[in-house]
Every structure is written in C-alpha cells, then in structure tokens.
Amino acid sequence: MTDSSQSAMPPAKGSAVKGTAFSILGAISVSHLLNDMIQSLILAIYPILQADFHLSFVQVGMITLTYQLTASLLQPLIGYYTDKHPQPYSLPIGMGFTLSGLLLLSVASTFPLVLLAAALVGTGSSVFHPESSRVARMASGGRHGLAQSLFQVGGNFGSSLGPLLAALIIAPYGKGNVAWFSLAALLAIVVLLQVSKWYQHQHRATKGQPKSPSLLKPLPKRTVAYSLGILLVLIFSKYFYLASISSYYTFYLIHKFGVSVQNAQIHLFAFLFAVAAGTIIGGPLGDKIGRKYVIWGSILGAAPFTLVLPYASLYWTGILTVIIGVILASRSPPSWSMRRS
C-alpha cells in the first residue's frame, strides 16, 4: 500500500533515535499486519454478505466503493494534516475506528449498516497508514529501505491472512464470528499505545531542531512531472486490478466452478500471499537486472496470463492467479520508493 507520510523527514542530528529501533519497527510491522488482515477480511466475506442480505453485484461494488473512499481518498488528506501537526496517539484512535467497524459488521442487520461498518474500517485504515509509515521512518535510524520493507511486508502478509482466517473462522459459522477479530484490533491498540508513547517522546526530542539539509540535487520539474505521471499510472493499474480480483474472484470461482465459499477464500488467500511474495522477490531481482526492467516487465508480464484466465480450469486458474500476483507485485517493492533511479 502506498502511504502518504513517506515524505516525513528523517530524524535530525541530535535526535533521540540512536541507530535502528528494531523493537519499534517490529511493533509497527505487527500492527500493520493486524490492520491489513482486518481490511482483507472484509473483502473475503463478500459471498457471506451477499447470501445474508441477498445483494446484487452492484451492491457488493458499493461496499468496495464505500471502503475505498474512506481508506484511500481520506488517507492523503490525513497525511497532509499530520505532516504539519503530528498526532502520535492517532494510531490507537484509528484502530479504534476499525474495532467499531468490526463490531458493527458482526451485528449488522441491514445493508446501510454494512456500508457504515465498511466506512468505519476504511477510516481506521486511512488514519493508521500515514502516521505508522512516519513512525517506521523515524525508527529507521537512517536505514529507510530496511524500515519501509519491514513495515510493508507486515501489511502484505496481513492482507493474505484475512481470507484464510475467514475460511476457518467465519465461513463455517456465519457473519457473527467477525466479532472474534475485534481481539486482533484490541491487541493492535495495546501495541500502538506503546508505539505512540515512543513517537511522542521522539517528537518532543526533535521539536525545534533544524531540518537536515538534503544532500540530493533537485531534479528538473519536467522529469519529476513525467516520473510522477508514470508512477500514478502504475499505482492505478495495480490497485484497480487488485481491487477487482479481491472483490470478485471468490464469486467467479463459486459461479464458474461451483466451489464452496471456504474453497474460494483459500484461493483468494493464495493470490494475496503471492502478492506479498512478489513484493519481496521484486527487490533483489530489480537490484540484479535493473528496477526499470522489472517495472515494465511486471506491467507486460501479467497481461498474457490474465487473457488466458477465463478459459482455464479450476486447477490452472489457481496457478495463473498466483503467477499474476507475483508478477503484479514485483513492480513495487517497498524500499524502491526510498531510492532514486
């Protein structure tokens, strides 16, 4: 996931941060895992929600739209505000929104309440990501690539766990078992309270200190505009594809191959796990053959497998989606955003 607060400045000279704070990086990575696990859980139970509320595919899309409007569009606004006014305790507060959304979803009896629950979970995500990414950078001790990699990998593997846990805990027993995942949100709140205390201490220690001068020569405006344009196209295409697969892949498997909801959720887990693995594989591969080739290869490489997908058997559908997930995610390993080509 692209987080708006990666532009936060590294700790200035004289900061209380001495070296890489691995305990904080571990805590924020675990919190990211729990947060993104809960986010993907919402997508994984779409077939259950459709059956319970007799939803059309348009209504399923409305759930995704509501979630994305709060989780994605709010995030840069919150990041912009917290860049100017850091809010250390926004981390547990954001997870509180997620907790509220989970509890509401577990007892929701109407479609509007499901939409409200999705909005609360999305709001929690939009509050969590900017400040948690900032914390990862602050705790890096200058090793920004390592810090962002640990942070992002936690989120990616959390995303893959959601469908698997939904298949084991929710699908056999019903929507009410969503409430059990509030324990994960509570655990994240406890962890984030400790992280927030550390964050507040670092903020006070560096307040009023001059920012470290940049050692990089500014790029021409035309180069920056062109690079940002390409980046936006890549991000849009990746997340458009991911949102489409995450929202409708389970329905596709159920309707075309007649598999159970649990089986479909396990296939979704395999796809999202492949996405997480692709993020890790893309880094060393890019270092070896060049990041530019990996980026363009990931764009063109997924296309032939996608075109074959509608004609594949269930077995080959599972294989193809895993390959697509690895290729698609290899274009954006987390540490690349911290480097200059």
Stretch-by-stretch model annotation:
Residues 40, 68-76, 159-160, 272-280:
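Residue-level signature of mid-helix packing/kink "hotspots" within the transmembrane helices
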Residues 42-43, 224-276:
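Extracytoplasmic gate region of multi-pass secondary transporters
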Residues 54, 86, 107-112, 141, ...:
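Helix-breaking motifs and short loop linkers at transmembrane-helix boundaries and internal kinks
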Residues 73-112:
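Conserved MFS/SLC helix-loop-helix module at the cytosolic interface between two early adjacent transmembrane helices
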Residues 117-154:
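Cytoplasmic helix-loop-helix junction between adjacent transmembrane helices
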Residues 151-198:
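Helix-loop-helix hairpin linking two adjacent transmembrane segments in secondary transporters
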Residues 181, 194-217:
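Flexible cytoplasmic inter-helical loops of multi-pass small-molecule transporters
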Residues 286-335:
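C-terminal transmembrane helical hairpin of 12-TM major facilitator-type secondary transporters
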